[in-house]
Amino acid sequence: MHPFQRTELLVGRAGWERLQHARVMVVGVGGVGSYAAEALVRAGVGHLTLVDFDKVCLTNLNRQLHATRRTVGASKVGLMLERCRSINPKADVVAEQRFFEATNADELLAPGFDFVVDAIDNVTAKVALLVACHDRGQRVVSAMGAGGRLDPTRIRVTDISRTEKDPLAKVVRLELRARGVQSGIECAWTDEEPNGLDERVQDEFSCICPHGENEHHSCGHRNVVQGTVSWMPAMFGLTLAGVVVNRLLGRPVLSADRTPALGTPRKKKQRVNARLGAAPRPA
């Protein structure tokens, strides 16, 4: 008998033991990564390494798991370390309060991991991590853009080469291609186009983090700050955790190979006819 027996009932004894011996790194423990990390430790993953340089800001309160009024100004990885250990004291959790970049990739990836979760929102750091994982043959799953979106039903999981309608994914694809990486990166993304920003609110936006600016990714220095909601980053993080656990267990993951949204009745009929082998009627 143990606190996580409900998970063992679902995945079986062998699956549970596999998860207990798994080593996973989560890079970026903000809105996406905090939920991914907690879901992984609750699922029974025995070792987690958490990497993030940042501290909790007031503007994190709307979407990040560790963010409360009491935790503003505290280290994100420190808070998640404490939270994960309080959930499963037997888990080996390591916190690295550092900014992931190409110069420290070898050091941070050196311990060896069964899976890496990319929940970084800085393009330079994100590309550095994905290239490092690709070059090492390291399994990784990456989150594309959750900001500016509202519809949780449109999150998909595919190879990055199949992403569309996602400005972040487009930039990442181009940067990866410039470094010789065309595909082989699994990612969670949405085909919902980013919603527009309220110009009145945008004009009034200012960084209100009480601990001030940081040297890597300050909101006050961004050209555009996307609007966010509570559920979309969480859904992305939980999706990443689900992909990792299913992959570790050797189980298939439902992806965007499924039939896309059918759209209008005419398009729906055309797609149904195509699947049945019927000739489409003239428009």
Regions found by a protein language model. Give the residues of each.
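Adenine nucleotide-associated cytosolic modules
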Residues: M1-A283
